[in-house]
UniProtKB/Swiss-Prot annotation:
Protein name as it appears in the record: Protein hrde-2
Expression sites (tissue/organ): Expressed throughout the male and female germline.
Organism: Caenorhabditis elegans
Coiled coil region boundaries: none
Top-level taxon in the UniProt lineage: Eukaryota
Function as written in the Swiss-Prot or TrEMBL entry: Plays a role in germline RNA interference (RNAi), and in particular is required for piwi-interacting RNA (piRNA) gene silencing. Facilitates the binding of the argonaut protein hrde-1 to small interfering RNAs (siRNAs) targets that are required for transgenerational epigenetic inheritance and germline immortality.
Region named Disordered: 211-233, 267-305
Organism placement in taxonomy: Eukaryota, Metazoa, Ecdysozoa, Nematoda, Chromadorea
């Protein structure tokens, strides 16, 4: 689920792990979700939201695992906690405090969920990655994310893809299920349009305003029939159909579908496959502007390829 460490000398080796739905309500379950990734490397920093940081720290204490904790607005700027971190190699840090405390580069990072402001996540990854290249080392990233967090799943999948990490099957399936890219939706709409355009639609003669030629029963003085004269066909009564399912065949068994209904159907398909606007709230991740958060960010990376 990550890059092969033999293929590069520095950078990030990322893995994503599934968090069960119940993990959001139990302190012990929060700890159990990250237990297997603690202590695998010499130094580890657990990154989480402010409310979770205290709970995880208390759980570590109960497990007799000495650790440091970094929060925003610490009295001494976190000097004492930094000293403990150099000694024990394990720290719990809130997302808001990560940029303030200026911790040294760790061997591994555990993201327990993503920041509530998901825009901060790619910026944090870029900062860690930049330091890893500078120190010429591989840093391990473990991301524990809930399967119910649609936006977080989408952001994580793009970060894995952009760094050529293997995207787990369950992540890819969730992205397709919950966060189908707009390009796929537009492609589906075009396929529907092409399919409908290839189906011939019968057009009645009356619709073309054509007239039928019928022989006249009037005879001349000599008794010979007179030349036929064009007689307009009887005008058919228009039937207004509210739905395509109400259309019935004519006397010849043919169906005539009004053009307006075809256009209506295409427009309805547009609505059916258009992206859900409810997902595009103010908290949704802005992928196009993600590259501008850091002056050193490689603008060659794109989130939608």
């Amino acid at each position: 689920m990550s890059q092969n460490s033999d293929t590069f000398d520095s950078g990030l080796q990322m893995e994503v792990h599934k968090m069960a739905e119940a993990d959001n309500s139990s302190v012990q379950q929060k700890f159990d979700a990250i237990r297997d990734y603690i202590g695998r490397k010499e130094t580890t920093i657990i990154l989480c939201e402010h409310d979770d940081s205290r709970k995880i720290k208390l759980t570590l204490n109960k497990q007799r695992m000495e650790s440091s904790m970094f929060l925003t607005e610490m009295p001494d700027g976190g000097i004492q906690e930094k000293t403990k971190f150099h000694r024990n190699g394990l720290a719990v840090c809130s997302y808001n405090a990560f940029d303030e405390v200026d911790l040294p580069l760790a061997d591994s990072y555990i993201f327990y969920g993503l920041p509530s402001n998901v825009e901060a996540f790619p910026r944090m990854l870029h900062g860690i990655e930049k330091s890893a290249h500078k120190e010429n080392k591989i840093v391990f990233i473990d991301i524990v994310v809930s399967i119910l967090e649609k936006i977080q799943i989408k952001v994580v999948s793009f970060e894995l893809y952009n760094r050529k990490c293997t995207v787990p099957t369950w992540v890819a399936e969730l992205v397709i299920t919950y966060c189908a890219p707009i390009e796929e939706q537009q492609q589906r709409i075009e396929e529907i349009r092409r399919t409908r355009a290839s189906v011939p639609v019968a057009i009645s003669d009356a619709a073309n305003g054509s007239a039928e030629m019928v022989p006249s029963n009037t005879t001349g003085s000599s008794g010979s029939p007179m030349s036929t004269a064009p007689v307009p066909a009887a005008k058919k009564e228009k039937v207004q159909y509210e739905s395509i399912r109400q259309i019935r065949p004519n006397a010849q068994g043919r169906y005539f579908v009004p053009a307006r209904m075809i256009n209506m159907d295409i427009e309805m398909s547009n609505d059916e496959y258009s992206p859900d606007e409810s997902e595009n709230d103010e908290n949704e991740y802005d992928y196009e502007n993600a590259a501008r958060y850091d002056d050193g960010y490689d603008e060659g990376h794109e989130y939608c390829q």
